[in-house]
Amino acid sequence: MGIQGLLQFIKEASEPIHVRKYKGQVVAVDTYCWLHKGAIACAEKLAKGEPTDRYVGFCMKFVNMLLSHGIKPILVFDGCTLPSKKEVERSRRERRQANLLKGKQLLREGKVSEARECFTRSINITHAMAHKVIKAARSQGVDCLVAPYEADAQLAYLNKAGIVQAIITEDSDLLAFGCKKVILKMDQFGNGLEIDQARLGMCRQLGDVFTEEKFRYMCILSGCDYLSSLRGIGLAKACKVLRLANNPDIVKVIKKIGHYLKMNITVPEDYINGFIRANNTFLYQLVFDPIKRKLIPLNAYEDDVDPETLSYAGQYVDDSIALQIALGNKDINTFEQIDDYNPDTAMPAHSRSHSWDDKTCQKSANVSSIWHRNYSPRPESGTVSDAPQLKENPSTVGVERVISTKGLNLPRKSSIVKRPRSAELSEDDLLSQYSLSFTKKTKKNSSEGNKSLSFSEVFVPDLVNGPTNKKSVSTPPRTRNKFATFLQRKNEESGAVVVPGTRSRFFCSSDSTDCVSNKVSIQPLDETAVTDKENNLHESEYGDQEGKRLVDTDVARNSSDDIPNNHIPGDHIPDKATVFTDEESYSFESSKFTRTISPPTLGTLRSCFSWSGGLGDFSRTPSPSPSTALQQFRRKSDSPTSLPENNMSDVSQLKSEESSDDESHPLREEACSSQSQESGEFSLQSSNASKLSQCSSKDSDSEESDCNIKLLDSQSDQTSKLRLSHFSKKDTPLRNKVPGLYKSSSADSLSTTKIKPLGPARASGLSKKPASIQKRKHHNAENKPGLQIKLNELWKNFGFKKDSEKLPPCKKPLSPVRDNIQLTPEAEEDIFNKPECGRVQRAIFQ
């Protein structure tokens, strides 16, 4: 029966485990628990008296499972009825008999399911059934032991003596006997619930004041097989009494149990005597020692205990009879000889193998039996490993040694072999990696049969000495868009004029403006290299920490298919068009950039680090950037000086410095003079093409203003003036603003977006972009009060008029028809006075 609710009460001390945890160890099994489970499957046959051995197969299935995990099981069976438990056994026997009679009656009535339930409750495990399991287990070399009385006390003794390391059972009484480790509710796969005595302190209900003795007292007070509990006393109240009581005399505590619980409980004298008997039964119940082969009490008797008075805990018999009972040779009820098994003369049984190395273990199977003369209990795993370690590993506190690993071949990870470098990069090669790279696709010349090599000549400034170094960087050709090339050639042959403004920017390739550039710039050029003027600025060209970088780039674009390799800048090349792109550069000292570049398309121009929306001047996509696309409509002037756009950039920079620094007058004067000189030399066609030049906004962290460049007012203006409005720096990254295309800038400004109406279209198809277009800085800017439309403004526009229109007073009496006609807004007030409406009036007033 066990102790009601004990497992739930101490669930904190339980732990789910698998039985393989005890591999190589010995466990004891309460076999009657397996017998009861196995008998349920054949309860109907057992009730009818029909022969069956299904319960034997059920038990052996668990035995084989333990053997397969390398665990040695010892099957323990119940023996004679304990005198202190005769009343309990008699009541159980009467209950089983009543269920058996009821089941037979229900079976006669045809109620099979209800009869089967009654047969299940009437199962009685006899010694004959246990003997069948003993024979089946011995055939496989499994030790079996029949307890002189109860199997619980015998199992507890085996665990305390160290013969077994754990106990497999379904009865919670084992904890009251003082077992150290108990495995409960184990299934056929080996999963179970382990309760360790050392973990009982983890139970919050028990606390840290509980001992093994108090735990046993609690189990007895809550009700056990040897004594029923008082009315209204369970585990919780029994635990509360023992936690509050400090008196070591348990008899006095029981007499004052009503005082501790504040209950009106009268404790009879018979209950106190029954408590003492139950406690002595848990302590001194007789068990069989398989090593000494005699009956002994579970615990040694104390000095004040008389063994003669403990007859209720078991009566002594002769040791030879006790041995025969333990071996299963005698019936526990009649003491008749039913078997002649002798462990000393019996041949070792050969159990079936469970793994490939089981043969080595079968040789010592007889020696490992508990019935062998030389058998000694296996010490616990903790004591085996601790004792030698203390001797072999002395303390190393305060000991210092110098350890050398020179002679040791330590395992290490294989080192990753780096790729050997043929030669280190020079400073010029390193600088060329950070410069703008351009490519030119090689094309086949049908007339000459030779190929022109793609090259890019880059003049890199020397930051130390000052003179420029010329480098030729060869890059692999880039694959062009075949479909775009085909459409371009088709448009050129048909003579169609393609306006870039009417094309979709999503499907426009990098070379889609070649035909336009060929028609615009048709004059030969005398020079293909442009030298920029020196800039006396105090910012670094490479890697300023504030993120400011302005690069001056002059791109010479040749739209022809072939350019000879021996071309000299001074030669005259007919039918060629060259497009230049300007950039500004800052350096620590004065520097010059001279580039002679012949890329196939403008789409291949991109910087080394092209950040999206950042400092890069070229797009990541093959489509041309806005500034590059518009530069193809400009033509180079004959003067060897820089282009006007470069001057525009210089002037803008000088004007931005003019507001903050008053000491830069020489620079401004020099820039303005150069601007006026070069503007005068600008030709008519050059001025027409420069109408579409672009204004690039420069960045800074200190100033904020708008950038607005008004180039020309109308197409008919043939002068080459460049009207420059205020130039300043924004707190946003550098962007290329394209006239006619409104690009979304970064959300760094808190001002609202103001869109001006578009003006008249230009000849190129692109409209001029409004001067000041600002975006909201944050995505949450629409929640600001200044940017929201209030309800009052909406009601002003859509509200109803309060004052209704009143008809002017008249001297004539009102007419119910004439004066109730509401005039429409289109009708005139004197509609009735017109002669052409007289017929209508007569029809109305008649």
Swiss-Prot record:
Any GO molecular function: DNA binding
Species of provenance: Homo sapiens
Residue positions, PTM N6-acetyllysine: 482
UniProt-recorded name of the protein: Exonuclease 1
EC number: 3.1.-.-
Outcome, altering residue 419 to A: Complete loss of nuclear localization
Function, as annotated: 5'->3' double-stranded DNA exonuclease which may also possess a cryptic 3'->5' double-stranded DNA exonuclease activity. Functions in DNA mismatch repair (MMR) to excise mismatch-containing DNA tracts directed by strand breaks located either 5' or 3' to the mismatch. Also exhibits endonuclease activity against 5'-overhanging flap structures similar to those generated by displacement synthesis when DNA polymerase encounters the 5'-end of a downstream Okazaki fragment. Required for somatic hypermutation (SHM) and class switch recombination (CSR) of immunoglobulin genes.
CDD domains xrefs: H3TH_EXO1, PIN_EXO1
GO biological process, one term: somatic hypermutation of immunoglobulin genes
SMART domains on file: HhH2, XPGI, XPGN
Listed result of changing residue 757 to L: May be associated with a reduced risk of colorectal cancer
Keywords assigned by UniProt, alphabetized: Acetylation, DNA damage, DNA excision, DNA repair, DNA-binding, Endonuclease, Excision nuclease, Exonuclease, Hydrolase, Immunity, Magnesium, Meiosis, Metal-binding, Nuclease, Nucleus, Phosphoprotein
Region (N-domain): 1-99
